């Protein structure tokens, strides 16, 4: 017994007699061991004692007062303070077997049911986190509403947590123990106690009142208890139904016997038993009806998502457990309506509940009407914004399809089909399982049995693979074949690994009567086949799915190795045949050449399959000679690179074949170049084609192979110089020559960095790089855009590679190879970016229309421009190009935000990390450039309200936001920015005289956007610096042309004691900055810096350095909006400790926010509604309870419960006559029966409840 319970027995001493000191030892033992079961949490004793006579009751209760410990399982249990353990603590600790705890309580109940029920009541109160305790006189003399109101006042207002919401493994275990306790309690009481018309009435009445409370903890805990209680009762009802059926069968069997063999006594016993079972069944149904109508109907619409989820989860259990009673439309509609809940966790519980029902195909007839009604909603949930909900919705749709294919229309299926291409893997896998069941699991059993003996194209998988290809083509997402394969991998792995069938479909001619595959189908099948090979060999999802490669389990690793061996052994033989058949098709060949990278190349040697390797090399050589497409040549080059890996024994054989191939191409290239250069402008198309085709092949191979010994750079350089000098070189040859020369330089650098180069080697490479950089720089002025773009990218790459970072890592000897771009080259690179990246949208659209390019080409062009900008931005970030060049990029931040905003923002962030001050000077320079351009267009008299001026100010505001919230870190940078801005504004004097404003004065209005980033002390310093440029005449001016100066001065002067961050003056400014106020805050004792020490501390610094004011204390930071402590409704609340609803409840419950605003009016309305509805009686006593733990809305309704359809409105307005409406009959032993009898299942009560907002539900 807890200490607070001691007054319970002290107050009831008038009902008991004193315990005799002369009592026997046996009596004392009994008092300690048995009668102390009246205390909460008494587990059963291992040694059973004789029951006490009624005369001993007083002595026992007196003994309880003197007892200082409790028992569990016959052993004393105490907490650290020596106080006895309560029932709540026993359940929380979970050390005792739950059945023992329940048996002990039952034993106590048989002796004194009031004391036992008091224990149980306090158990529910304490499980809600309430510190109060119900005393015996409260239990006997007070109504539930009064008890609940009293307990509400005992809540701890300091914390909003209660056991069901507390974090940690102990409290998670408590929840399961709590639910287990209730289930075991009903199970152990199911044969007698629950029918005594006292225990269950008391518990149900209490839980009904608690579930109707405004206190979340009470509602949450009591709803969980009531739902688990209902589940246990459903189990009891199910058992009773089974017993009734058995009894009825026994009765029928006995009655059908011949009269001579019939036992009349047995018939009477069976009739009596059937009658008792029927009475018990009726009693249980009354209890379930009371819980359902008194608690579930209201709480499944609760404002708290956890409470709604509990209700939906349990009703799913009832319908699955006792489908004969609960699986009907009267109960299913609650799940259907809640599919529209606004919280994902509630929708998830609905889907889980339905899945458990649709899993049983025998239940489908009972679900038919529900399926027709809510199928559209379920299908739409496959696109739920919560991925977990979407996954379960797809699984539910799959179950519906499995049970009844006619239930889903073609449109429904198509809505799920496209999800196999989702980037979220669980969604895609679930959709893949649906696709598998829909397309690959419907076969004629006889036909399938006949085909099962066949292999290859005639096997069952042959038709399925054709279906997969057709699906892939119809989806028109050919670039996502890897996603489709990954989606089907778990459900259709056997089909996807049938490479034998796939290759037979590709290689063999169709038999008579069989339709041949089209060219598109063959291309799709090859693409899918390559994706399945990749998936099997790598054993992880494709790029874009999943967070990365996970560690494979031993089983997965073994499967991966087996699959790799299987595919290697198969395609070593078939790949040369496939290449031979499709050698003329570039797309097919490029895909097929991806396969060797997934081989286990050791099998060539261990399996004695060198002849197949020779066949493969022969086919690859044939493909290289036949094709000039970049994709094909790169695939061939990569295949050679893989086969030439040094760790494999086949390396020598492949290297010889590769060298022979390169020798042929180099000889051909050298001769064709000589011919082309000799003929000059008279060269014909054949000469040009010979050079271009051979150069393309060599360039593709040079990317992955070191071809420096063939000295390709010489002839490439000759082609480039000739093209520059004479201008007649075809652009494709120039582009390929540039790329090939670039690869040659990189391979030379690799040799030098890997070895110990001589000084001569370094000088030779330096000369090569210098000459190539000069050629690239000259190409920037080429008339052909592809040439210019190629030259620009190579320039940026080489300047990055041969920058000062080349010497890092102990490679100081490479200093001769470092190149720093001169001013002229930097200017040319910047000009190229301005001309080719920041182009007008109108020009782009016109060019696209002229070239008849579609949307895909526009995206490709944008991607190319983004690469150009990123390449130049890297030069700025790595300090290869001067940072001030970034000003021309930063000024386009707003205009091209959608296209390049992320790149510019990242460049700005990186440059600030390098040098905050220089970055700030670059930002102000970009604004000055925009301002100068505007002045040139509109003249010195700018319209401050024009869109152009507003655009510059908006850009300045965006730049100011990038400085962040830490003003100490950005202090010097912001001060430098203001200094440069002031100097720019007063750089030129007005030629008309000093009485006229300087031409750039309007720039101060732009500069004022950065005033909010100045510390208060720095504002004074900046203001002092500004005044150095002002004359007395300027200070006295108030005309409109001087408004920028007035605005800027005000932004610096304001923020004295209020510490406001910025003030925008002038009629044209519509933006306001956040205001930080210190009003109402206690003063902080800190050292204040004198104003004199701040003046001119950084005014005389150089352009690149600025001295910050002396060491300053951290400024006092206040919240942007100070929370007021006043309470508008405080006068209406009597309790001094009361306050508004808890902040979490208030923030997340819009109904509370409305109700607090309209409190007086709602109070009157609520009071009338409460008096008119009997079931609101419980709340009448708690209307003015502690506000800190209450939610104003007693019956909150969430808006998204219903579907917006007329049919559901009719469903909502029906009278629910088909639901159980059996009420418990009145009895003198039933407590507060009036609270359970009213029919709150009336639809009118649901819709007209005072918790609504006065708005329609639909």
UniProtKB/Swiss-Prot annotation:
Bias (Basic residues) ranges: 1076-1087
Residue list for modification Phosphoserine: 24, 756, 1062, 1065, 1093
Primary location: nucleus
Biased composition (Polar residues): 10-19, 1095-1106
Cell location: Nucleus; Chromosome
Keyword rRNA processing found: no
Top-level division of the source organism's lineage: Eukaryota
Biased composition (Low complexity): 1062-1075
Keywords in alphabetical order: Cell cycle, Cell division, Chromosome, Chromosome partition, Isopeptide bond, Mitosis, Nucleus, Phosphoprotein, Ubl conjugation
Region (Disordered): 1-59, 1055-1148
GO biological process: cell division; mitotic spindle assembly
InterPro entries noted in UniProt: ARM-type_fold, Cohesin_Scc3/SA, HEAT_SCC3-SA, SCD, STAG
Bias-annotated ranges (Basic and acidic residues): 1137-1146
Post-translational modification as stated in the protein's UniProt record: Phosphorylated by PLK1. The large dissociation of cohesin from chromosome arms during prophase is partly due to its phosphorylation.
Cross-link (Glycyl lysine isopeptide (Lys-Gly) (interchain with G-Cter in SUMO2)): 1161
Domain SCD: from-to ranges: 296-381
Pfam family, any one: HEAT_SCC3-SA
GO annotation, cellular component aspect: chromatin; cilium; cohesin complex; mitotic spindle pole; nuclear body; nuclear matrix; nucleoplasm
A GO molecular function held by the record: chromatin binding
Its job: Component of cohesin complex, a complex required for the cohesion of sister chromatids after DNA replication. The cohesin complex apparently forms a large proteinaceous ring within which sister chromatids can be trapped. At anaphase, the complex is cleaved and dissociates from chromatin, allowing sister chromatids to segregate. The cohesin complex may also play a role in spindle pole assembly during mitosis.
Family listed: Belongs to the SCC3 family.
Quaternary context: Cohesin complexes are composed of a heterodimer between a SMC1 protein (SMC1A or SMC1B) and SMC3, which are attached via their hinge domain, and RAD21 which link them at their heads, and one STAG protein (STAG1, STAG2 or STAG3). In cohesin complexes, STAG1 is mutually exclusive with STAG2 and STAG3. Interacts directly with RAD21 in cohesin complex. The cohesin complex interacts with the cohesin loading complex subunits NIPBL/Scc2 (via HEAT repeats) and MAU2/Scc4. NIPBL directly contacts all members of the complex, RAD21, SMC1A/B, SMC3 and STAG1.
Protein name per the record: Cohesin subunit SA-1
Organism: Mus musculus (Mouse)
